[in-house]
């Protein structure tokens, strides 16, 4: 299908005090996707340590969602949800296999079918990279330090940046474009004793700082986890905790290098944005920055992700939309935005109708409309990995901003947290008689939401 330029991308819904008209060709799309980047790893989110000036500026020019979450906290599954707009129960990807959803129903596939020049750069964690489905594809394996064709070393973040800039500089000028830049950072190099290997340019950062331990990075907090985690040193989140955080010295070294990797990604994001501005297309480009999952930094005695706790499921989400009136830029929005909302948001910005298979929603009305729509107040979380339950147990949850009901299906165990009074999930209320009536309602709603996403 040939692409037909739109006279304007502003729909009637957006002709309000929060929107400005963007006339001309179809909107370009750039998705900046970080790895294992939890929601508070931004200085604009209140983090007192990490330096992210470029992403802070992006937030000032757009909208930052303060309660963005993933529906499954693991890279391959979450990325499948981001591309397809579907929960794991529907797209069927439970590990790192190729997409089961038809490619024509993903956002890159639909955009290419409608005349977009599409590119993917960096991490691809869903089977063999489908190079033929993109006009420009640079996906590769590896973590942190790699080698160029001539054998000289290059950091993977620099390679991600270089490939993204090549896409932008070689793209055809007569087509709208969509670039997904999937950074490898801040993922650890599992198996390497150092875990995090940042760029040389960032090694001087954070040297003289002492990074505070999280409130729940304690043996007591671990003891409150279910016994199949707390008393199981074969549990992968405990294994990786020992890799990274089991001594104060190790914690400081790991966290400083994690933040150095984050600052390196921030710098590369800034250079991509600068290239868009240099080419005169920034103000006709929807830019989205987000992460594939959250991350435990020792909270509850854990490392990595997988589970439905706040540190694991919450991710950064910044949307810079050129339709947003300048006076409205820099706002935050506490709506429950999800990774499944990214694909419908992209397609709507391109003037396309999301396929009925997509379960997410267009985020734009939340920040463009003077009277934002009624939005979800809860969602179903799921993670059912294809592995031994003693290594990574399956977990499900009903998540609201003020309460969370967790179910561990492998062990038929429940947990209940009142997030309004216990935001760090320290006090499990599942056995509290005062919660009995509330629990009946939560169990019922949990079952309804689980069925609805299938």
Where are these regions (language model features)?
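Formylglycine-dependent sulfatase
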Residues: 2, 19-408, 413-414, 423-444, ...
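Bacterial N-terminal signal peptides
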Residues: 4-16
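Extracellular C-type lectin-like domains
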Residues: 417
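Conserved, charge-rich beta-strand/loop surface module that forms ligand/interface-binding patches
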Residues: 420
């Amino acid at each position: 299908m040939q692409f037909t330029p739109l006279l304007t991308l502003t729909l009637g819904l957006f002709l309000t005090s929060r929107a400005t008209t963007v006339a001309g060709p179809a909107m370009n799309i750039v998705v900046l996707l970080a790895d294992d980047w939890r929601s508070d790893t931004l200085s604009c989110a209140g983090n007192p340590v990490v330096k992210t000036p470029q992403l802070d500026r992006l937030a000032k020019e757009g909208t930052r969602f303060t309660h963005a979450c993933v529906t499954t906290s693991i890279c391959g599954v979450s990325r499948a949800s981001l591309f397809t707009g579907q929960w794991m129960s529907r797209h069927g990807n439970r590990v790192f296999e190729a997409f089961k959803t038809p490619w024509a129903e993903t956002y890159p596939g639909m955009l290419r079918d409608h005349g977009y020049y599409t590119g993917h750069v960096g991490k691809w964690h869903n089977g063999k990279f489908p190079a033929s489905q993109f006009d420009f594809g640079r996906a590769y394996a590896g973590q942190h330090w790699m080698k160029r064709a001539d054998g000289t070393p290059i950091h993977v973040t620099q390679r991600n940046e270089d490939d993204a800039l090549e896409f932008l500089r070689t793209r055809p000028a007569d087509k709208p474009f969509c670039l997904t830049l999937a950074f490898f950072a801040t993922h650890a190099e599992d198996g390497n004793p150092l875990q995090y290997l940042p760029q040389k340019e960032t090694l001087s950062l954070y040297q003289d700082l002492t990074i505070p331990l999280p409130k729940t990075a304690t043996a007591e907090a671990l003891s409150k986890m279910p016994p199949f985690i707390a008393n199981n040193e074969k549990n992968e989140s405990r294994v990786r905790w020992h890799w990274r955080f089991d001594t104060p010295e190790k914690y400081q070294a790991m966290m400083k290098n994690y933040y150095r990797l984050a600052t390196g990604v921030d710098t590369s994001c800034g250079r991509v944005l600068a290239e868009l501005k240099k080419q005169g297309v920034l103000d006709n480009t929807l830019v989205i920055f987000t992460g594939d999952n959250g991350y435990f930094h020792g909270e509850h005695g854990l490392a990595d992700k997988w589970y439905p706790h706040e540190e694991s499921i919450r991710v950064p989400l910044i949307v810079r939309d050129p339709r947003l009136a300048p006076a409205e830029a820099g706002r935050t929005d506490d709506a429950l935005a999800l990774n499944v909302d990214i694909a419908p948001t992209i397609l709507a910005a391109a003037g396309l109708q999301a396929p009925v298979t997509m379960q997410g929603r267009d985020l734009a009305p939340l920040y463009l409309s003077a009277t934002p729509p009624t939005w979800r107040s809860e969602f179903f979380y799921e993670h059912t990995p294809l592995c031994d339950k003693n290594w990574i147990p399956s977990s499900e949850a009903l998540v609201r901003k003020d309460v969370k009901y967790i179910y561990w299906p492998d062990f038929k165990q429940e947990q209940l947290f009142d997030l309004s009074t216990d935001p760090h999930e320290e006090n499990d209320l599942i056995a509290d008689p005062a919660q009995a009536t509330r629990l009946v309602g939560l169990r019922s709603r949990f079952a309804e939401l689980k069925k609805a996403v299938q």
